[in-house]
């Protein structure tokens, strides 16, 4: 038993990694696709950028991402043409918005761009999502009004982006 363990330990490759070489891929620009009501609710208790900045400072993290909010497909494509985004957060409203259609089109055009669903908890959205193809999304999150969830989403996607390297 001990011999087998020694053999397995020899097979492992350990290397020193400098701290500066960890987390080389980061999220700097986030595109938030939401209807005006959901965007307002998200910012109900303060600007997203300010809250994220304060949360990053409290956690001793550097380089908080910038958020760009869009409401329509036209605004989405204009921003995607002019800015390099690292993450797209889609907030499908309870109305018949085309958020999922926009997300599908983004994934076709930018297949490596991570897409996340952030949805308020409601029965109508739950029923709607049951009929949607969610495979294009990295994750689906239920938002209950706490913007701290955005920091967690960003850190989760960054960890996933750096998994192979770190």
What are the functions of these language-model segments?
Residues 32, 116-117:
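Structural beta-sheet core signal
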Residues 67-70, 140-141:
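General small-molecule cofactor/ligand-binding pocket signal
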Residues 97, 101, 117-152:
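Alpha4 helix (beta4-alpha4-beta5 surface) of REC/receiver domains from two-component response regulators
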Residues 107-115, 159, 165-166:
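P-loop/Walker A phosphate-binding loop and immediately adjacent motor/lid segment at beta-alpha junctions
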Residues 48-49, 104-107, 133-134:
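Glycine-rich, phosphate-binding/catalytic loops in enzymes
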Residues 41-44, 64, 71-77, 85-112, ...:
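Conserved phosphotransfer microenvironments
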Residues 1-66, 146-166:
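Non-catalytic signal-transmission and effector/linker regions of two-component phosphorelay proteins
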């Amino acid at each position: 038993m001990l011999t087998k363990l020694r053999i397995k330990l020899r097979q492992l490759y350990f290397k020193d990694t400098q701290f500066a070489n960890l987390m080389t891929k980061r999220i700097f620009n986030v595109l938030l696709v939401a209807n005006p009501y959901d965007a307002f609710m998200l910012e109900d208790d303060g600007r997203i950028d300010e809250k994220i900045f304060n949360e990053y400072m409290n956690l001793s993290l550097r380089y908080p991402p910038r958020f760009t909010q869009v409401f329509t497909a036209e605004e989405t494509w204009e921003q995607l043409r002019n800015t390099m985004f690292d993450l797209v957060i889609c907030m499908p409203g309870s109305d018949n918005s085309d958020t999922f259609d926009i997300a599908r089109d983004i994934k076709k055009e930018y297949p490596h761009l991570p897409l996340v669903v952030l949805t308020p908890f409601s029965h109508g959205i739950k029923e709607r999502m049951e009929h949607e193809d969610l495979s294009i999304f990295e994750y689906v999150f239920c938002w209950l009004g706490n913007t701290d969830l955005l920091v967690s989403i960003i850190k989760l996607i960054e960890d996933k982006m750096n998994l192979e390297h770190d």
